[in-house]
Amino acid sequence: MTRRIDWRGTDTLPDRREVLHLQGIPVGVEPSARVVAIFDAAVDAYTETAEPRALLADISREAFAEVFRGEGRNAPVTPIESVAARAGALALFVATVGARVTDRIRDLLAHNEPALAVMLDAVASAAADRLTRRLADRFDRAEDPASRSGLVTLGYSPGYCGWHVSGQRALFAYVGPDAIGVTLNESCLMHPLKSVSGVLAAGPADIHQFTPAWAFCADCRNRTCLTRMRQLPALERTG
């Protein structure tokens, strides 16, 4: 089954600290009044232009194995294969905050407002990432809450954890995100730019635990897996 989800822009606003961190301001550092004013203006621009929407498609382990195989360009061994094999439920997703946000960023740059453009870009990036968490919550609620007690749902995306970015093609073929206006270019980059895709895996918290010591981990700049693993105990309690 494939479900479409639509949100209001205000439903997907990221936390200010998260956005400012993307701007290079460390957590715990109080931003200046000017930075706060620019952030507030960026939030207004985001809520005015954002059109957040997503498709969520249930998939079996066997079907996901085919999608994940894609064009055969993945790393020889990846944590995603282990996660999927142990997950109780899987779903593919594609989500976007829409093209109007990116259009507004371009307009701001064209009108010599780089500070607001860069802040809006950070707001939109953080909002797009937040869509994955919202979809995970939706995926949890779609099942019997009693059967999901203590389980954790996390997302994994092409381009990360050994899943080659060309895997987008098989994922898109399965989900059909043209229905929400999301397409791929020849390099497998998504349009609109502020979009996310991947697989949601629901299962006991320990399926998401691994040591990031694969060769491809050396190319990862943010290591968000470490942050997610540190948060697993709290996520398990609320699952």
Protein language model annotation of sequence segments:
Residues 1-117:
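Active-site helix-to-loop segments that bind/position phosphate- or nucleotide-bearing substrates
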Residues 146-226, 239:
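Short terminal or interdomain "cap/linker" segment that borders an active site or interface and mediates
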Residues 229-238:
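Short cysteine/histidine-rich zinc-coordinating motifs and their immediately flanking basic loops
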Residues 34-37, 41, 126, 130, ...:
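Conserved active-site and cofactor/substrate-binding residues in soluble primary-metabolism enzymes
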Residues 87-155:
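Conserved mixed alpha/beta catalytic, RNA-binding, or beta-rich assembly cores of soluble enzyme
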Residues 48-56, 132-133, 144-148, 226, ...:
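Intrinsically disordered or highly flexible coil/loop and linker segments, enriched in small
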Residues 39, 46, 104-105, 139, ...:
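Generic structural signal of hydrophobic/aromatic residues within well-ordered alpha-helices
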Residues 43-50, 139, 143, 221-224:
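Structural signal for hydrophobic packing residues in well-ordered secondary-structure cores
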